[in-house]
Amino acid sequence: MNKSADSWMILKEWFPDLSDETWEKLKQYTELLREWNAKINLVSRKDMDRLETKHLAHCLTLTKFLRIMPKARLLDVGTGGGLPGIPMAICYPQAKFTLMDSIGKKVMVVEDMVKRLELSNTEVRRGRVEELPKKKTYDFVLGRAVTSLPVFFQWVRDKVAKGSRHSPANGILYLKGGDYTEELKTSKLTPAKIWSLDELLPEAELGEKYLIHFKL
């Protein structure tokens, strides 16, 4: 068995609730990401051998917690190579996703991948989130290692509509690596919930990574 096939078997053990159709689409996405990453640095090239079990697994941990109703609207800020936005759009076809980045070449790549994956529930926008109108448009705003928690919170807090028909309630879902306590202490932000991803999937060896939910 080759290393790639072994990685997918491991992922299926970690996320057994995902359908075969979803896995096939996720495989197509990683193939496209590798294709583009050889031309444009979207993901650290030293991580490409562990793309599935490190970066994709990190994003897929959201599926352990996120239960959303049809037509939910989600914004992925600083999407880079489409993480976590594209995997989430694949896993939640009933929802509407906006993937946003300020760097033109990354937006071009993500647009290409969305088109080739035929993700009709996904739009891609170039720009900075703080320049968006102050409209409470989205049920959730997603981010992964974009900036510090206080800065991200200030950027997106006025973009989230109040509501509790989803689980968790509407708000910010931020994938954070490293210690977060000092950032929360100095900013006086109070998350609704913090999940340790290493405790959730110790076999994944994700390290000191967390999913932090702010209810708005």
Please tell me what each predicted stretch does.
Residues M1-P70, L75, K105, E111-T122:
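Class I SAM-dependent transferase core
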Residues L60-G143, F153:
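Conserved SAM/SAH cofactor-binding pocket of Class I
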Residues M88, V156-G163:
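Class I S-adenosylmethionine-dependent transferase superfamily signal
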Residues E130, S148, K176-T181:
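Short "lid" loop at the C-terminus of a central beta-strand within the Rossmann-like core
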Residues S148-D158:
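A short, conserved alpha-helix within the catalytic core of class I
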Residues S164-D179:
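Conserved beta-strand signature within the Rossmann-like core of class I S-adenosyl-L-methionine
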Residues G177-L216:
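Active-site capping/gating segments
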